[in-house]
């Protein structure tokens, strides 16, 4: 009897087969500028000058590799905004399609408000805490129906966090009397509006003047919005202490 009681006190258990449990991940919309100015060759990849878009494309595809478990969609915008890929867990397909996108696909101007509005439309029915937008532009809003801050106000009410990125160098290379010279570039990026959008929605504004800064920015966003649904494996456990306890009770009754 004492041996059975000791066995019961040890709380024997039976563990079933491991079961995979998924927790909820982010619903992340990448909103990317493909207006005409994204052809400006002021970024560098692998030691060679490239267009802004080429750098953004490469960095965004690298970013996707770190978001396994999230649903990611892409909106491209220029004069118009359109849903390029809907929210999906198939990040390989998103990356492949992103590699095929190019400047001018949505017109030459910049409809920031419409692009953000479209991102909100495609996340409207999703849980607020899971919705994140990363909006990148190299210009100022000069097209579209919705104003950027109107869209930001809607995002705020819907609980959508918006990170904004201004992309483009501060200088431009021009030929002078003594060869090529770096000259200050005009204020192409409407940084004030991008900052306001981020502040209103609880996000952050970042400025990328070169490829290295762009990589760092997307790494920062990746850290700020960690993937929440790393798979967890658990084994269902059934308590068996009652078996020796019942046996000890039965023996004590019979021996009485």
Regions found by a protein language model. Give the residues of each.
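An amphipathic, basic-hydrophobic helix/alpha-beta surface used to engage anionic
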Residues: 1-29, 34-61, 65
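Extracytoplasmic
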Residues: 23-29, 58, 67-72, 82, ...
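VWA/integrin I-like adhesion module and closely mimicked acidic/polar interface patches used
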Residues: 107-110, 121, 130-132, 139-200, ...
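Short beta-strand-loop
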Residues: 40, 68-101, 117-126, 173-191, ...
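Juxtamembrane amphipathic/hinge helix adjacent to a transmembrane helix
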Residues: 208-240
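Second-shell loop/turn segments in exported
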Residues: 42-50, 60, 81-84, 100-108, ...
């Amino acid at each position: 009897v004492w041996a059975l009681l000791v066995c019961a006190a040890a709380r024997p258990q039976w563990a079933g087969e491991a079961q995979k449990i998924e927790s909820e991940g982010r619903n992340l919309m990448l909103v990317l500028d493909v207006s005409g100015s994204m052809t400006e060759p002021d970024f560098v990849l692998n030691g060679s000058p490239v267009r802004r878009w080429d750098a953004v494309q490469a960095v965004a595809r690298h970013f996707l590799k770190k978001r396994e478990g999230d649903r990611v969609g892409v909106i491209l915008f220029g004069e118009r905004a359109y849903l390029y890929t809907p929210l999906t867990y198939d990040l390989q397909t998103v990356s492949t399609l992103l590699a095929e996108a190019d400047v001018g696909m949505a017109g030459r101007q910049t409809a920031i408000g419409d692009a953000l509005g479209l991102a909100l439309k495609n996340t409207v029915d999703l849980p607020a805490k899971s919705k994140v937008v990363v909006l990148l532009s190299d210009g100022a809003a000069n097209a579209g129906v919705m104003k950027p801050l109107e869209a930001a106000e809607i995002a705020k009410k819907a609980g959508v966090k918006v990170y904004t990125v201004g992309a483009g160098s501060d200088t431009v290379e021009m030929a002078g009397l003594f060869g090529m010279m770096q000259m200050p570039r005009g204020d192409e990026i409407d940084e004030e509006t991008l900052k306001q959008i981020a502040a209103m929605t609880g996000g952050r504004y970042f400025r990328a003047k070169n490829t290295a800064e762009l990589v760092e920015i997307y790494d920062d966003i990746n850290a700020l919005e960690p993937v929440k649904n790393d798979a967890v494996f658990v084994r269902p456990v059934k308590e068996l202490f009652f078996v020796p306890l019942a046996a000890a009770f039965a023996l004590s009754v019979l021996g009485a």
